[in-house]
Amino acid sequence: MSQNSLRLVEENSVDKTKALDAALSQIERAFGKGSIMRLGKNAPVIEIETVPTGSLSLDIALGVGGLPKGRIVEIYGPESSGKTTLALHTIAEAQKKGGICAFVDAEHALDPVYARKLGVDLENLLISQPDTGEQALEITDTLVRSGAIDVLVVDSVAALTPRAEIEGEMGDSLPGLQARLMSQALRKLTASISRSNCMVIFINQIRMKIGVMFGSPETTTGGNALKFYASVRLDIRRIGSIKERDEVVGNQTRVKVVKNKLAPPFKQVEFDIMYGAGVSKTGELVDLGVKAGVVEKSGAWFSYNSQRLGQGRENAKQYLKDNPEVAREIETTLRQNAGLIAEQFLEDGGPEDDAGDAAEM
């Protein structure tokens, strides 16, 4: 009885293998070679290429060393919180690696002088200032499908105005129009983005939901589609000012990884954004170095490998700016211990502050 049962299973498995092979060959004949494959036989597919964000602590918090290529990323936050700055830093890092980048400026507010200061190569940056939301997303789709773009930024979702709204009267009520536009565009874009290995960053604004009694009243514009399609969502906030004497020279910024499909989410980091200079890399090296024990702090003095960096944080930052080889050494050590730093020293912000679980009407 057991022999018959065993023979039956063997015959059944052979039949299943033959049936599967026939199905695979039929799919490949209908849709082309590579339309279906065994994942284990194509190991490079698993490797996820990333682009640094310009912030060492954020790269570590993301768990994979930066923002992922071939995925959709959403950066949202209040006004003047550093959303465009973070996107421009990512473009600059991609260009350093030889990548081609594009910027769809729906807000018509890109400052080329500031972008150059952040390290963006303006001569090789493609820029579009579309008239309507449909035009912006059509340009995005065409650039992505070309397969030549490495990073594409759309600034911002809130400024993607549907054609019907532009052609209508000022007081016309057109509920859900922008949400439908985004939903349709993302359905088209997702497969192209993955195939072309292009990272698309959507910058988004915050609105307030009316009549919310419990939970956060904040929501992002453009409906719910972007929340689902995005592999990474970053919530960026200004939490304070940096002063030199009485003059404000920068912002203290907090970024929370609200969603991450590639590593554990909810990591939270803080760094400085200096006016006219962007993310303060030396400030991050000092702060992360102290947390990880790479940089020693004794009273107000900072030192590295028994070498004094300076008295006070600002003096230590200036020393690293004047001695880039020491800064590179500290950065290399921190990147090598990224996993330990992310696990032990970066704050876990928790899932409670997820802006916009409900679509804006």
Swiss-Prot record:
Chief site of localization: cytoplasm
GO biological process, alphabetically ordered: DNA recombination; DNA repair; SOS response
Organism domain of life: Bacteria
Positions with a binding annotation for ATP: 77-84
Keywords attached to this entry: ATP-binding, Cytoplasm, DNA damage, DNA recombination, DNA repair, DNA-binding, Nucleotide-binding, SOS response
GO molecular function: ATP binding; ATP hydrolysis activity; ATP-dependent DNA damage sensor activity; damaged DNA binding; single-stranded DNA binding
A Pfam short name: RecA_C
Location in or out of the cell: Cytoplasm
Keyword DNA damage included in the entry's annotation: yes
GO cellular component: cytosol
Classification via HAMAP family: RecA
Function as written in the Swiss-Prot or TrEMBL entry: Can catalyze the hydrolysis of ATP in the presence of single-stranded DNA, the ATP-dependent uptake of single-stranded DNA by duplex DNA, and the ATP-dependent hybridization of homologous single-stranded DNAs. It interacts with LexA causing its activation and leading to its autocatalytic cleavage.
Family: Belongs to the RecA family.
Protein name, entry field: Protein RecA
Species this protein is from: Brucella anthropi (strain ATCC 49188 / DSM 6882 / CCUG 24695 / JCM 21032 / LMG 3331 / NBRC 15819 / NCTC 12168 / Alc 37) (Ochrobactrum anthropi)
